């Protein structure tokens, strides 16, 4: 019985150790991907003056309108900046692409105290920054302010929203 208990404890500790090693390894891989993404975003921003720039209004992105500027190098989309307006907010977005795939998005959202069009002009009551890092078509990190979101309803909602907005902008 004692030998069986020792073996069970040994297997349990081995499992915990391996789980820890895999988690640390996955975190290290994510950090490497983040470093690569940041380097690519910096390179895109450094070369932005060389890209072909096109600005247009885009439908079906936000309720009160969206103006987007597209930056292309040859036929490759590198970056989109967008000003998006809703009834109770405005937000700016920067979307970065590598080989046609979204790699990073930055959103700065200003929330109003009331709807636009009311008697008193709306005032910004809060500002929130969101950062989304993608590798191989998968979201690998989401930051809302300085807090990393990993799961949950808000995570799923924001992930779906950023993918949808990026797709609508790209397809316009």
Residue ranges and their predicted role:
Residues 72-114:
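Mid-chain, structured segments of secreted extracytoplasmic proteins
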Residues 1-7:
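N-terminal secretory signal peptides that target proteins for export/translocation
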Residues 103-143:
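An exposed acidic His-Trp-rich patch
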Residues 63-67, 88-93, 124-129:
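Short, surface-exposed coil-to-beta transition loops
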Residues 28-87:
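N-terminal secretory signal peptides
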Residues 10-23:
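Bacterial N-terminal signal peptides
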Residues 69-72, 95-97, 130-136:
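Aromatic-rich beta-strand edge motifs centered on tyrosine
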Residues 135-172:
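C-terminal partner/receptor-binding element of secreted or periplasmic proteins
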């Amino acid at each position: 019985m004692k030998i069986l208990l020792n073996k069970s404890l040994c297997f349990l500790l081995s499992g915990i150790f391996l789980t820890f090693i895999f988690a640390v390894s996955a975190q290290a891989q994510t950090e490497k991907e983040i470093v690569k993404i940041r380097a690519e975003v910096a390179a895109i921003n450094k070369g932005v003056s060389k890209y072909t720039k096109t600005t247009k209004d885009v439908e079906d992105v936000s309720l009160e309108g969206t103006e987007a500027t597209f930056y292309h190098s040859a036929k490759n989309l590198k970056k989109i900046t967008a000003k998006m307006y809703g009834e109770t907010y405005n937000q700016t977005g920067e979307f970065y692409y590598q080989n046609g795939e979204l790699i990073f998005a930055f959103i700065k959202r200003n929330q109003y105290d009331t709807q636009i069009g009311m008697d008193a002009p709306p005032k910004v009551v809060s500002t929130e920054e969101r950062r989304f890092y993608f590798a191989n078509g998968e979201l690998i990190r989401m930051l809302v302010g300085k807090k990393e979101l990993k799961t949950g309803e808000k995570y799923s909602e924001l992930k779906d929203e950023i993918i949808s907005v990026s797709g609508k902008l790209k397809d316009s």
